[in-house]
Curated annotation (Swiss-Prot):
Known function: Cell wall formation.
Name of the protein described by the UniProt record: UDP-N-acetylmuramate--L-alanine ligase
Binding site for ATP: 119-125
Gene designation per UniProt: murC
Signal sequence interval, chain numbering: none
Ranges where the record places region Disordered: 344-411
GO molecular function annotation: ATP binding; UDP-N-acetylmuramate-L-alanine ligase activity
GO biological process: cell division; cell wall organization; peptidoglycan biosynthetic process; regulation of cell shape
Any Pfam family: Mur_ligase
InterPro entries reported for this sequence: Mur-like_cat_sf, Mur_ligase_C, Mur_ligase_C_dom_sf, Mur_ligase_cen, Mur_ligase_N, MurCDEF_pg_biosynth, UDP-N-AcMur_Ala_ligase_MurC
Length: 588
């Protein structure tokens, strides 16, 4: 049922991940769409290509805003815009209805069987997997997802069926007005400290969301998650409606949907498990995306799809084809320092390679479609850790002094210039054949910006390093999150060999908390080498360190490097820029 839409809706912040799919759905239903955004972006380009007029840049004078709003029925404003934003003020002065995203979603989803996928982490992946499964089953859903999914052609899908899959965010109460037929809660953890003062307030929001399931609906939850357990306990205390029975999933022995015999293979991106439903084996789940958390997301999809009439065997088959979403453990490219010296024996199975190999399509697309530049606010003038010889190139990030090696610290000694410290007191990992190739750098980009997300992402990466060093580059996202979750960030990088922390991406905030990236550098537990690098220097520093580590007849890290860029801001531009920098001759 493609709903017919007749209103002219003007979206403020139309290029954002929250509003761009809503604009596409409204447009697909026959409605008229226009909008504005502070920055140009691929999403803006997509909308313009479909005939949507979009003004990019700062808000103009009131007279011009009024002209842009002529004929508009409703203005939908991003939650990132303050009430005193000139375009919101102008719209109200013209007597137009101004709605936030949270207020528009019930209107957009009315008349559908709504599957609302909520949770502190994993929403985008779960929503994308579920949409792919439902489409393959011929149910032709409409969907709004918080990430670009190449298999779906973007972050929105306008289907003809009566199902609507909606990634449902707790931020700003975005899911508060929904009435889902099926509600999914992947996990519940303290996040968005700018609006949730503590974990209890987050749980209160999810409890209210869970109680909004329609009569005859279902509540699908991860039974292994302690935050979910707290929400269920509160629902029980309040009296859970019989109309919304709870279906749980996880690794626990008493889960209705359970994964057992979990297997991950070093150097392999796949995750596998045997799936039990009600204690009965229904098949093997194989995913082309890594990590135990991916298996949990897939279990949620199995539970929902089965309730909607899709056979588990068909769901398993479709899940095996899922290739991932943008910025979710996304391959950026790889670079090879050069063909190894024939006098130096390579690890068994390693093949000779041309001097440079990379993924030009991925790198070029990211370089041209993502904004390149510093974070929203000027980088703070913090303490840059000292650099050591040789003078021709920057030395690796200086090591932070660490206590004696023990269960919480990888090594007591700082890394020497041009070398990588051992991950353990017993010495470096044994070099083995690298699936990408020795003397190589592989770059993965991930949206992880919460300690739990970082921990899970690095665990998945560590399982596939295959003899390579694991480097993590973090751009903290928002001052409030960085300050509130600093202790969590400090212990989230235990799987990394080296950590670079750059300037905080401000997003919608101003710096009034007095925190700096060096606060994290001083607290990091686990990695042997850590350091703060100002944003303007980051790519040059990484390029120098990569060359220094991989170059020479006997590289300091012969197995290669797996480098992860982590964060929700402009850090996604670093991978393509680093590949470009490595293509240039080294200074000398």
């Amino acid at each position: 049922m493609t709903r017919q839409r007749t209103q002219h809706v003007h979206f403020l912040g139309i290029g954002g991940s929250g509003l761009s799919p809503l604009a596409q759905i409204h447009l697909a239903g026959g409605g008229k769409v226009s909008g504005s955004d502070a920055e140009d972006s691929p999403r803006v380009a997509t909308l313009r290509a479909r005939g949507v007029p979009v003004r990019v840049g700062p808000a103009p004078a009131a007279e011009k805003i009024a002209a842009e709003l002529a004929g508009v029925d409703v203005v939908v404003a991003s939650s990132a815009l303050a009430e005193d934003h000139p375009e919101i003020v102008a719209a109200r002065s013209l007597g137009l209805a101004v709605r936030r995203r949270s207020e528009w979603l019930p209107e957009l989803t009315a008349g559908y069987r709504l599957v609302a996928v909520a949770g502190s982490h994993g929403k985008s992946t779960t929503s994308a997997m579920l949409t792919l499964v439902l489409r393959a089953a011929g149910l032709d859903p409409t969907a709004v997802i918080g990430a670009e999914v190449s298999q779906l052609g973007g972050n929105a899908l306008a289907g003809s069926g009566d199902l609507f899959v909606l990634e449902s965010d707790e931020y700003g109460g975005a899911f508060a007005g929904l009435e889902p037929t099926i509600a999914v809660i992947t996990n519940v953890e303290w996040e968005h400290p700018d609006i949730f003062p503590d974990e209890a307030s987050v749980r209160t929001a999810f409890t209210a969301f869970a109680r909004r399931v329609r009569p005859g609906g279902r509540l699908v939850v991860c039974g292994d998650d302690p935050g979910v357990a707290a929400v269920l306990a509160e629902l029980h205390r309040q009296g859970t409606p019989a109309a919304a029975p709870v279906l749980d999933y996880g690794f626990g022995t008493d889960r209705r949907w359970r994964a057992v015999d979990v297997a991950t293979v070093a150097g392999d991106d796949t995750a596998r498990a045997v799936v039990l439903h009600g204690g009965q084996e229904i098949g093997t789940l194989t995913l082309a995306v890594p990590g135990r958390h991916s298996l949990l997301n897939a279990l949620a999809v199995l539970a929902v799809a089965t309730e909607l009439g899709v056979a588990p065997a068909q769901t398993l088959a479709t899940l095996a084809t899922y290739t991932g979403a943008a910025r979710r453990f996304e391959f950026v490219g790889f670079w090879r320092a050069g063909t190894p010296d024939p006098a130096v024996p390579a690890a068994a199975g390693a093949a000779a390679a041309p001097p440079v190999r990379r993924d030009p399509a991925t790198a070029a697309a990211a370089a041209t479609t993502a904004p390149i530049g510093p974070p929203d606010s000027p980088p703070p003038t913090g303490i840059a850790l000292p650099r050591a010889a040789p003078p021709a190139v920057d030395a690796p990030v200086a090591a932070t002094p660490a206590p004696a090696a023990g269960p919480d610290h990888a090594a007591a000694l700082p890394a020497p210039a041009g070398a990588l410290a051992s991950r353990s007191p017993t010495g470096p990992a044994t070099a083995v054949a690298d699936p990408v190739g020795e003397w190589s750098l592989e770059i993965i980009d991930d949206y992880a910006h919460h300690p739990t997300e970082i921990r899970l992402t690095l665990a998945a990466a560590r399982a596939r390093t295959h003899g390579r060093a694991l480097w993590a580059v973090l751009q903290p996202h928002t001052y409030s999150r960085f300050a509130a979750l600093l202790d969590g960030f400090a212990t989230a990088f235990a799987d990394a060999d080296r950590v670079y922390v750059t300037d905080i991406y401000a997003a919608r905030e101003t710096d009034d908390l007095g925190r700096h990236p060096t606060d994290l550098v001083e607290r990091l537990v686990g990695p042997a080498v850590v350091g703060y690098v100002p944003w303007p220097e980051l790519v040059d520093r990484l390029a120098a360190d990569v060359r220094d580590t991989l170059s020479g007849p006997v590289p300091a890290q012969a197995g290669g490097i797996l480098l992860l860029t982590l964060g929700a801001g402009t850090i996604t531009t670093v991978g393509p820029r680093l590949l470009a920098a490595l293509d240039e001759p080294a200074a000398g």
